[in-house]
Amino acid sequence: MNTALEARNELRRLQAERLDAVEAGLGENALYMTDLDNDIEANRAIYVGLAVTEIATLRAQLGGPQLG
């Protein structure tokens, strides 16, 4: 993933997959659900990191670097 938008879309896809899995009766499959939850948490961290970086980059472009 290169952008926060891509990471957000992947996070939404994983969250939808989790809902679909529960509706399909896979909620009791601990191994699958743990793996999916781990993927969601990892992707959430990637999304936040990319979003913060993009915001900081835009802020620097608009107002110059922060000093002090």
Model-found features: residue ranges?
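Extended, charge-rich alpha-helical interface modules
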Residues: 1-68
